[in-house]
Amino acid sequence: WRSIDDRYDGRKIIEEQKQRLVQADERRLEVLRNGLELGEIKVTAADMDDLAFSVAVRNITDGHAVPTGFDAERLMFLDVTVTNGDGAVIYRSGDRDPNGDLRDTHSAYVHAGELPLDEDLFNLQSKFLVRLLRGGEREQVLPINTSQGVLPFVRPEAFPTTIYGRPRGTRKHKQTIDPLGTRTAEYTVPSELLTGAGPYAIDVKLKAQMVPVNLILAIQDIGFDYGM
């Protein structure tokens, strides 16, 4: 970098890479728009008791579900905001905690009781369910069997998983939308939240994310590639 000519050449490379990043973002948006369709907001109730509305999310592809691939890691959710006539936010769903996680059962802030669970969350991310020691199941970020002893040990399956199509100790709770399928998200804003002057405005955004933050937290002790 001592040579000014080298710095100018380096700047040209950086500008070219920035343009390519913009093009990549445009292509990603194009892929999402070709795969999903967000319907119109339908208000089903608007009185002194509550404000209720719904919005349909449709998979407009005929080849595979949405999301596809590693659907237990990929988030596709609705970010919903309701504001009053003064512009104040009176209702949120699909917002993030300070870590960047949705307010679902894997949020550290929800676990600690610092934020309420987002009971209206619309999320197409499938979840792993693992079998517990004394029966029953629970959601887990990583479906890896763990030993109760002090030594790390992954117990191998006693039966071939190819026969059952999945490991017997874990399964996935499917949340994806089938090809050409539709799922409707429904929301209700209770009367105690309908504060301030009207009219009330509803804003709905469909967002996609490759991996949740809680997955990064679960694997960070192992380390990352490229020295990250």
Range-by-range predicted roles:
Residues 1-228:
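Short, conserved sequence motifs used for protein processing/export or organelle targeting and
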